[in-house]
A protein has these predicted regions:
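Core alpha/beta nucleotide-donor-binding catalytic domains of modification enzymes
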Residues: 1-150
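ATP/NTP-dependent adenylation/nucleotidyl-transfer catalytic domains that generate, transfer
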Residues: 140-173
Length: 173
């Protein structure tokens, strides 16, 4: 889904995905949304509006192709960020359980793999990938956790901090 937020960068990412799917013979459905307008019209954050629209389109596409499951690419680091975000927001035990590997038709097969491992795998096979530049901006609390807090904790306290955070989240599940 092209969120209508990142302009030329998003268009470049869309072309990349179209070319990759074409080379691999994978069917592709592309939709364009104006996430900012949807967020404003519905009183939502841009993040929440994007999530709602993304999952809506994923479900519609799965139905169109007769797919029972939708695999998304959340990984171990996303899960650790979610646990910390929920902890800091005071969500209690349910929030500490993190991202569920299976929720209805959504499956998350990469939750046991770190972002670093994914990047190393792609690099070892000489595959390129796209990165959303907004993930590096610290405009959102999640990004501050991703870009500042977790790297600091990993460097200064424990290099396996994400694993330990997720081990605690297992008890809350």
């Amino acid at each position: 889904m092209n969120h209508g937020i990142r302009g030329a960068e998003a268009d470049r990412d869309e072309r990349f995905v179209k070319e990759l799917c074409g080379r691999m013979g994978v069917p592709l459905t592309v939709v364009h949304e104006k996430v900012g307008s949807y967020a404003a019209d519905h009183g939502l954050s841009t993040e929440e509006a994007g999530r709602i629209l993304r999952y809506r389109h994923l479900k519609e596409t799965a139905e169109k192709y007769g797919c029972a499951k939708i695999a998304v690419a959340h990984h171990e680091d996303d899960d650790a960020e979610t646990v910390l975000l929920n902890l800091f927001r005071g969500s209690g035990l349910p929030g500490l359980s993190g991202i569920r590997p299976v929720r209805a038709e959504i499956i998350r097969p990469l939750l046991c793999v770190s972002r670093k491992e994914i990047e190393e795998y792609l690099t070892s096979r000489e595959h390129s990938w796209c990165e959303d530049s907004t993930n590096k901006e610290n405009d959102y609390t999640r990004n501050k956790i991703r870009n500042e807090l977790l790297p600091w904790v990993t460097e200064n306290i424990n290099s396996r901090a994400a694993e330990h955070i997720l081990a605690v989240s297992e008890f809350a599940a």
